[in-house]
Design a protein with these regions (language model features):
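Nucleotide-activated donor-binding/catalytic signature segment of Leloir-type glycosyltransferases, i.e.
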Residues: 135-152
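Short beta-strand->alpha-helix junction loop in the catalytic core
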Residues: 18-20, 49-50, 68-80, 129
């Protein structure tokens, strides 16, 4: 038990979500963490990028000097190789079907890009309360033939059956599915938003990052992401796949 330890215990805080938004406002769920920051012995983030931002946030709060450690929340035991040719124009996304994941944007992106790439297909894996809304959006856009909700599945052997992974989440503290998709050699596409996307997506190497800001209209974000998706599939994908494995 904690109280029976011979040596004094250390108090740490693990940041599981964004702590400071683009507009400079702090995430309210961490209000008391920052109010009593000096009582903590150290903090833990999932990425080096969030560690850097947290250092800046603490400095603005007058709390410099508190150690911060970056510890990834997951890792890959091994890479997952494709057992054959990946189906052309195949895209996957996977997450909890929750409004914060913005799967609706992924649907709009693919629906727009499919007008220029008629063979494009998107499979959406995951379960959640947003499923009915997403199903209705797919019907509204008349995209039932090329966008499908696939439900929950063990994705390890599913990732290699696709050429590209699309994420439209507007912030991820890590991004486990991005890590898994990269480990299966997929080309990656998403917003240049903190923190997981720029950790795993290397611009022009294994995919594309689309500039993101909270002030940019969603219609523009969708168009720019659709343009990049088309550009990706008009490219030789082999170097992108190898860069993800690397």
């Amino acid at each position: 038990p904690l109280l029976e330890k011979d040596n004094p215990s250390k108090l740490a805080m693990v940041f599981h979500s964004e702590h400071e938004f683009e507009n400079g406002h702090l995430n309210y769920e961490y209000y008391y963490v920052f109010k009593y920051a000096k009582r903590f012995d150290y903090f833990i983030t999932a990425t080096d990028l969030q560690k850097e931002v947290l250092e800046q946030t603490l400095a603005k709060q007058g709390c410099q000097g508190i150690p911060i450690y970056s510890i990834p929340v997951g890792h890959l035991e091994e890479l997952t190789e494709s057992q054959g040719d990946r189906p052309p124009f195949s895209v996957i996304t996977a997450s909890r079907l929750d409004p914060r994941k913005r799967i609706d944007l992924a649907i709009r992106v693919v629906a727009q890009a499919q007008k220029r790439l008629p063979a494009l297909q998107l499979d959406i894996y995951g379960k959640g309360g947003e499923a009915d809304n997403l199903r209705h959006l797919i019907q509204e856009l008349e995209a039932q033939d090329f966008i499908h909700l696939r439900g929950h599945a063990d994705l390890k052997q599913i990732y290699p059956c696709y050429q590209a992974y699309l994420t439209t989440s507007q912030w991820e503290t890590f991004g486990l599915t991005l890590m898994e998709a990269a480990g299966a050699g997929l080309a990656l596409l998403g917003f240049d938003a903190r923190y997981g996307n720029p950790t795993f997506i290397k611009e022009g190497e294994n995919g594309f990052l689309v500039p993101y800001s909270e002030t940019v209209p969603e219609e523009q974000l969708v168009k720019e992401l659709a343009d990049k998706l088309v550009q990706l599939f008009e490219s030789d994908l082999a170097p992108f796949h190898q860069a993800s494995y690397d």
